[in-house]
From Swiss-Prot:
Is homologous throughout its length with the C-terminal 3 domains of the pentafunctional AROM protein. The function of the 2 C-terminal domains may be to act as a molecular sensor that detects the presence of quinate pathway intermediates as a prerequisite for the presumed conformational changes necessary for the control of transcription regulation. This is Quinate repressor protein. The lineage of its organism: Eukaryota, Fungi, Dikarya, Ascomycota, Pezizomycotina. Residues 1-88 are annotated as: Sufficient for repression. One of its GO terms (molecular function) is shikimate 3-dehydrogenase (NADP+) activity. Multi-domain repressor protein that negatively regulates transcription of the quinate utilization pathway genes. May mediate its repressor activity by binding directly to the qutA activator protein. PANTHER family: AROM/DEHYDROQUINATE SYNTHASE (PTHR21090), QUINATE REPRESSOR PROTEIN (PTHR21090:SF27). In the N-terminal section; belongs to the shikimate kinase family. The gene is qutR.
Length: 901
């Protein structure tokens, strides 16, 4: 029996201070019951809240060292719940877990986003029986309670098959509930919510850590045996645990001003991160594509499958490194297209014992923490052998299967299956993959006699295809330089096979194989810079993204390109510094410069340059340039303005395909493609600042200040997010009415996000107007008017009328100005932070739209933190006096860590 589920032997005396239900759990386990035996786990373990935790950013403080003696286990393959994880789109979702894991909060978030009802199982029991569980137990015999419990549970699940989020407490996972949940999980997502010991102990207000630890060890296998998915609620620390500065006698007026100007971490930020993580997890794990597109950021590369792009990279990180070190996860992922988590932890030296008992929770915690800090897909890869570099020990079939199946519970975008295992093992994995894509992996430690020409490799590829893999990854150590040319021939050989073929990742490992890694087109494993010292150990790659990219440009596969910001007055632009820093860290020899012109004709200079890669478009040419375009993105066409131009070098075939193939390649320009990323930056900032209490619903109201190009982008961002009631105020009413008519004429029902055609746009004619009585107060405000003096026009010094900001739950205000940064509007909103208002300014929006432009220009992921840092540094150098506050800017960056969207 695997230690993953084997109950620790306990004496009954160990449980003397636990309540009767806890003692029953320990006694039953002590008598040898397996994880699949129905066990009573209900308990009233003190008072608790279901609130989620607080925030600590993206620094990875190795919380798993504490887990090593604190949490539970994997469930044996024969006891674990195996389902296909394919669900009808409207299937109700069940959340289970012990008290204090945050189930109720997560249910509310999920229901608000999906438009579903929350059903609390305990309240349902009380409604059906007229008694709460505790009272019913006291008034009836145990057998009567069990009988009634079974009836109520069956009724609960049968009555709520669709469009509900069902929250089950410990009482629902007793004897009868386990069986019914396992049956329900065949057609519905049943998600086990997990949390760390310290947070659970805090919420339960339990003093004895050891007793809570024992209960977690025992309850884990039970909950896993009747659920098909698992979400680890990562508790963040450092905010709620700290005394507020406002409570200190040293809190000065200067402190108050800095606090207002750096107010990005509002009290709801911890909930916001949790909300984003959980909604993304549910969309991924259930295969809800429309909701997934809504949860993912609208960056261009999110819309393209990785396997369809050229020269993509997977940052490869062993879980052992994350468990043992304080790691900056965002730095590890920077510019990569995927994050590969290698499960390389060693098993116990016995096939019977399998792996360590705490491993399941460590893996779940690691996956959740990594996901919090990345925006790219995750590849979950279990090493087939442990200690691979010294006396390798192959995992047992059961151990390998347990680890991979546990990974599938976590809903990774990709999971690998090792093709060295038997078909019977691999079929179990592939049959339960759900929405995850499967990469068939095969790594030779000793190359076959004929190397890549050996028929064995094609046979392995065909076997992976027959098993149902979505991609194939093959690798062997290089013994000569010629092996690098041989693997190229092998990839070509696969392409020439008849019928549709799977994407192939094929390369040589080791120092001699680095050349093949540079030219492998799909998901080349790369090592993050911070792990270079470990290159060649733990089976890590031997090349970084920067080295791979530099090799492609040095060998003339790709060309150095020139990019610009084009406008009438662009000397103040922060974009050149931001993009040039990004090119450098990515290993690209590109240059981004200012090109200023008093007329639109200045664009001719750009398009005559064969190395022209694209340009940002500034005022006043965002609309003037449209007649010159060969094509436009749907976003730019709807907005009626362009801020990004990309050259077209081939007019044959689809424009999208031509643009993808021509990125980073020089040549004559045949046309121009226009896009708009302003709306992306605005939309991301709205989502970042909008609290869970203000989740977008049909009744949500948005307000636009201004009627220019940025106001157009702001309206489009709101529609894309699903806002159905939008108001415009502009000093010139006629321009506001013209803008409203523009969008009311459009049919945006095919919008890629959660937007719909059922929106209405109204014009407010005066700042003295009361807010319309038939509409809720706005919770989203976007200001697109300049805050500085223009010509003879004085700075507007705009502030919102008090009667327009009476939302009881606050909201978010995005001011697109950053000249100056601390506008009257921003000061007004920051002074209302205690009422739930969040303020974001132009320096929040600018890098976000810049990330999207970088992707459009290069087809590669942007180094987000670096670009943000450069923007703030450049702003510091341009601004004088008190406008720039170094402490404020540092706080701004820290608050954005762990906020990929």
């Amino acid at each position: 029996m695997s230690i993953l589920v084997r109950p620790p032997k306990r004496r009954l005396a160990d449980t003397e201070n636990l309540d009767q239900n806890h003692r029953r759990v320990l006694r039953d386990f002590g008598q040898g019951n397996s994880a699949s035996t129905p066990i009573n786990t209900s308990a009233d373990y003190g008072r608790f809240d279901e609130r989620p935790g607080s925030g600590d950013g993206s620094r990875y403080a190795s919380p798993f060292q504490e887990l090593s003696s604190s949490q539970g286990s994997l469930t044996r393959v024969e006891d674990s719940l195996q389902t296909r994880r394919k669900f009808p789109p409207n299937a109700s979702i069940v959340l289970i877990g012990i008290r204090g894991t945050g189930k109720s909060s997560l249910a509310v978030m999920l229901a608000a986003s999906y438009g579903r009802r929350v059903i609390e199982a305990d309240l349902y029991f009380q409604r059906v029986t007229g008694r709460c569980r505790g009272v019913y137990k006291r008034e009836h015999t145990l057998s009567e309670y069990r009988r009634q419990e079974a009836i109520v549970m069956e009724s609960l699940l049968m009555e709520h098959q669709e469009n509900c989020v069902i929250v089950c407490g410990p009482g629902d996972v007793e004897r009868n509930g386990q069986m019914r949940l396992r049956e329900y999980a065949k057609t519905h997502p049943v998600i086990h919510i997990v949390r760390d010991l310290e947070s659970i102990q805090s919420y339960l207000k339990a003093r004895d850590t050891e007793k809570v630890r024992r209960f977690l060890e025992l309850s884990g296998p039970i909950y896993r045996s009747c659920s098909n998915l698992e979400f680890f609620n990562v508790s963040e620390k450092g905010i709620s645990d700290q005394p507020s500065a406002k409570d200190s006698q040293h809190y000065t007026q200067w402190d108050a001003e800095v606090d207002q100007r750096t107010q990005t971490t509002t009290p709801f930020l911890m909930l916001k991160r949790l909300q984003r993580d959980f909604l993304r997890f549910v969309a991924l794990a259930t295969g809800n594509i429309p909701e997934l597109r809504n949860q993912l950021s609208p960056f261009p590369l999110h819309m393209q499958p990785i396997e369809s792009r050229k020269f993509t990279y997977a940052a490869t990180v062993p879980i052992s490194h994350l468990l043992e070190n304080d790691v900056d996860i965002e730095e590890l992922e920077s510019t990569a297209d995927a994050f590969e988590l290698k499960i390389d932890v060693s098993a116990a030296p016995s096939a019977r014992l399998g792996t360590e008992s705490n491993l399941a929770d460590s893996i779940s915690h690691t996956v959740a923490t990594v996901r919090r800090n990345i925006i790219v897909p995750m590849i979950y890869h279990v090493e087939s052998s442990v200690f691979p570099d010294s006396a390798p020990l192959r995992r047992s079939d059961a151990s390998y299967l347990e680890l991979v199946l546990h990974g599938l519970r976590l809903g990774p975008e990709f999971v690998t299956v090792d093709l060295s295992f038997e078909d019977s093992i691999l079929s179990q994995i592939i049959g339960t993959k759900g929405s995850s894509k499967v990469i068939g992996h095969y790594s030779q430690t000793q190359p076959p006699p004929q190397g890549w020409s050996d028929p064995e490799y094609e046979a392995i590829y065909e076997r992976a295809k027959k098993l149902g893999c979505d991609m194939v990854r093959l690798t062997q150590p290089a013994t000569t330089i010629d092996d690098n040319f041989a693997v190229e021939r092998f990839r070509h050989q696969i392409k020439t096979l008849p019928g549709p073929q799977l994407p192939v990742i094929a390369y040589n490992s080791g120092p001699l194989g680095r050349q093949s890694c540079c030219f492998n087109p799909v998901l080349t494993p790369v090592i993050p810079r911070s792990l270079i010292s470990q290159s060649g150990t733990k089976g890590l790659p031997s090349i970084t993204i920067q080295e791979a990219q530099e090799a492609l440009y040095s060998s003339f596969v790709l060309d150095p390109m020139q990019f610009f910001v084009f406008g009438a007055n662009t000397t103040y632009s922060l974009s050149p510094a931001m993009h040039n820093a990004a090119f450098k860290v990515r290993g690209m020899p590109h240059i981004y410069r200012i090109h200023q012109s008093p007329t639109l004709r200045g664009i001719n200079y750009l398009v005559e340059n064969p190395n022209f890669g694209g340009t940002s478009v500034s005022l006043p040419y965002k609309t003037e340039v449209i007649p010159l375009l060969h094509s436009m993105s749907p976003h730019a066409r709807a907005i009626g303005a362009v801020n990004t131009l990309i050259p077209i070098r081939n007019l044959e075939g689809s424009t999208d395909n031509a643009l993808d193939l021509e990125k980073n390649r020089a040549g004559p320009i045949k046309g121009l493609h226009g896009d708009n990323t302003d709306w992306i930056g605005i939309g991301i900032c709205i989502r970042r600042g909008l609290s869970p209490a203000n989740a977008i619903r049909p009744s949500t109201t948005g307000l636009i200040i201004g009627a220019g190009g940025m106001a157009r982008a702001g309206i489009y961002a709101m529609i894309h997010l699903g806002v159905q009631n939008i108001f415009i105020w502009n000093r010139t009413v006629a321009n506001a009415e013209k803008l409203a008519q523009h969008y009311m004429r459009l049919n945006l029902c095919t919008l890629g996000g959660s937007g719909s055609a059922s929106y209405t746009i109204h014009v407010l004619k005066s700042l003295q107007e009361s807010w319309p009585a038939n509409y809720k107060q706005p919770t989203i405000v976007v200001s697109g008017i300049p805050a500085h003096r223009i010509g003879d026009q004085p700075a507007p010094n705009f502030q919102l009328p008090p009667q327009w900001i009476e939302s009881p739950t606050g909201g978010v205000v995005v001011d697109l100005a950053y000249k100056p940064l601390n506008t009257p509007l921003m000061r007004q909103i920051r002074s209302l932070s205690h009422r739930g208002w969040a303020a974001l300014d132009g320096l929040d929006v600018l890098p976000e739209q810049g990330f999207a432009q970088f992707e459009l220009f290069t087809g590669c992921r942007a180094p987000r933190r670096l670009m943000r840092t450069v923007i703030l540094q450049e702003y510091k150098e341009e601004e004088q006096g008190e406008e720039y506050d170094q402490s404020a800017m540092r706080t701004r960056l820290e608050n954005l860590d762990g906020q990929p969207m």
